[in-house]
Every structure is written in C-alpha cells, then in structure tokens.
C-alpha cells in the first residue's frame, strides 16, 4: 500500500483532524503541525486517516470552545492559557488503540469542498448502465435512475430514494411503449421532481440507450433542466445495434439531435462498432451487456479524473474548462501491460471503441495516466509522445497522473477529445464519421519518435509536425 505523508495544521486547543474525501487536508486557519496520512487502495476503497499518536477518547471529543478541564490543561496558569506548550511534551496514554476512522463515517457531503457528480440513467438502457456501474463499485458519484416503467425500477440496486418515476399521470407506471414523444411528455410532466433530483450537482452525466421511448424522449428534457440550472451536463449515449431495426435507428438519431442542443458535451457510442470486438457466437444478451459496460467506462473515465487524487491532479475546474459548451466529444480508454505498456495504452485509448473518429480536429484534450508505484517518468513520456504527436499543436491540453498501487504491472489511459462544435457549425452537419473515416480510425496508429532520455517538456512534443503518421504495426 502506498502512502503519502504531508504536514497538516490543526488548532492547538481543538485536537480535531479535518478530513476531506479526496485527501487529508488541513483547516487553513490553523497552527500546530501534525502528521496526516493519505493512502490509496484502488477505486473500491476510500482514503483513511490513521493517527500515529494515541489519544484518550475524551480528548477527541473535546469541543474547540470548551472551557472545562481537559487532558492538556495544567496546574500552571501559563500552560492553561497556552495549551500548545504542553502538547509538545510526551505524556502517558490510557488507551493503546490507534485511531483509525473510515472517511465515510467522519465525513458528510457538506464538510468538504468537492465536486458533486451525479449519474442519471434514463430509460431501460440508461438504468442498466447505472446498475452495472454500481456493481463495479464506482465511488465518488451519486447514482439515479429515471424511468416510466415502475416494474423495471423496482429491481434496480439504486437506493429507492434515488429512483425517479416520471409521467405518473401519463403512463401510470407502465412505460412509454417505445414512443419518444411519450417519454418527452413524461419528463415534461415531472420537471419539478427532476429539478429536485438535480439540486446541488456540479456535474451531471445523462446516460441512455437511444432508440426507445423513455431514454430517447426523456434524456433531452432532463439534460436541458440540468444545463438551465448551471450544471456541467454531459450526455453519453449509445445508438442501437443494426439488428434492432431501422425505426429505432431513426428515433435514436432524432433523440441525439435533441440531446445535442441540451448538453455541454455529448459522447455517442455506436453499438455496431462493438460487434467487431466480439465473436460471431456472442449471445444477444452479452452484446447488450457489453454496450452497458462501455457506458460505464465512459462515465468512469471522466469521473475518476475528478474524484481520484493524483500525482498531477486534474480537478473539476480543469474538466469544466475543457467540456463546457464543447459540443460533440470523443473519449478513449486504453489499458496495457508489458515492456511497452505506456505506448500501447496510449494507442489503445486512441483506437478505443468510444472514439468514433480521430482526435486530430479536437481543440481540447484532457488525458489521464494511471499506473502503480512502478510507473516511471520514461513511461509517462512515452505515452505523452504518442498523444501529442497526433493532436493539433494549438489544442488546449490538460494532463493528469495518478499512482494507484492496484495498477501494479499495468497502465491505464483515459483521453477526452472535445471542441468539435466549431467544425460542426462551420460544415453545417453534426460530427459523424463516414464509413471510410470509421474504417481508417480503427486501423491507423500514430508514430512515435520517443527515445530514452528525451525531455517530457510538452512544448517539445507540440513542435513535432509533418512526420509520417499512422504506420501499421
């Protein structure tokens, strides 16, 4: 387990540790130094605080403004006025049990300044994706499902208070029957309840499987409410498989067009592209599960960048700067092991099923590399070389790095490409890959002239132009 120990400050007469979820940080108005330990145990456990000193339980409960005789008070009036002096002296303890408190027990959402992220699964497809996120033990986000089908909602692992039935009068809990207009009217009927569910959010993911009734019609309404409230709103949706029929495909395109006008950033994942990653004998149910899992990866790729403390942190303000009013965006997630794992992970991210076309036209890129304690500067450099060699030199780039002991032996890279909105408007059409573009995007690979000992300075990477690209490996 990796640990990072940093000096923190705490009021000399309070003996209170201030705990934040993302890391252990000091109260900024304080005076005496104590040791604060930050530990990462992967994405399934929160950070914990372990006090290296042993205290009497009564001393922890002492109030900041308490005037009663405390463990640190003395017969000396000077020491009573200045208890920090006596705190510096060693003393005997009545308890030998170290204080180990779980962050979930010590913290509440109002005790620290942290971006509040909500994932709203709309309709059957969106709800299934949220269910899968919960099963994968995602942390740092709040899950909601919104549906017209009350029966489907009852079997979800989402907390009952976070299940929002819309259109009670219109549908009577029986669903939208695959009609997007009913889904839209149901969401409109329940706008006040939607606003209450979104209240207090800094960022909202609206996820759905497009082509049906509730998700296709309701997602644009829900996203519009969120954006009108000033919340950073990201839509991440799938398009139907070809075998689902032409009607659902057409409904999906109409729903996507409506959603695009009501979000800051829209990521569309074509389900048909996932078929290339599975065998011909794959059952239909497994194909849909794969689509749900891609939605999960997309949401987690962004939320992890914000919620997991990093070696080089990418905070919410960074992500907002890239994704606010960005229009159509692309995302890639790549993981690799072995001697060339950094370069391979970067290539896998660029060629991810989440990427509909290449990232060369993006005006904003945020990418994050996660590795174990064995992650080296050489590997960070190699991954950066692949990415910066491909993107536009004028693009706004934000980079983050996270060391997570659970990633020992492997590297994962998440890449978000934004800023296609300007090109869309200039060309008078939405960002979509042609058949040729999609084929090229699936096979091309950027070159890398990385050599051992070269600098990790970003400007050096951005100067590299005009080289031969996309050689087949």
Swiss-Prot record:
GO cellular component terms, semicolon-separated: chloroplast; chloroplast stroma; chloroplast thylakoid; chloroplast thylakoid membrane; contractile ring; cytosol; plastid stroma; thylakoid membrane
Polar residues compositional bias, start-end: 445-454
UniProt-listed Gene3D superfamilies: Tubulin/FtsZ, C-terminal domain (3.30.1330.20), Tubulin/FtsZ, GTPase domain (3.40.50.1440)
This protein's UniProt keywords: Chloroplast, GTP-binding, Membrane, Nucleotide-binding, Phosphoprotein, Plastid, Thylakoid, Transit peptide
Membrane topology category: Peripheral membrane protein
Positions of region (Disordered): 424-455
Sequence positions bearing Phosphothreonine: 282
Keyword Chloroplast: yes
Main location: plastid
Residue spans crossing the bilayer: none
Similarity-based family: Belongs to the FtsZ family.
Function recorded in the entry: Exhibits GTPase activity. Component of the plastid division machinery that forms a contractile ring at the division site. Contributes to plastid division in the vegetative shoot apex, at the shoot apical meristem (SAM) where the proplastid-to-chloroplast transition takes place.
Subunit description: Aggregates to form a contractile ring-like structure; contraction of the ring was accompanied by an increase in the filament turnover rate. Self-interacts and binds to FTSZ1 in heteropolymers to form two morphologically distinct types of filaments, termed type-I (smooth filaments) and -II (rough filaments), in a GTP-dependent manner. Part of a complex made of ARC3, ARC6, FTSZ1 and FTSZ2. Interacts (via C-terminus) with ARC6. Interacts with CDP1/PARC6. Binds to PGK1.
Protein name: Cell division protein FtsZ homolog 2-2, chloroplastic
Organism: Arabidopsis thaliana (Mouse-ear cress)
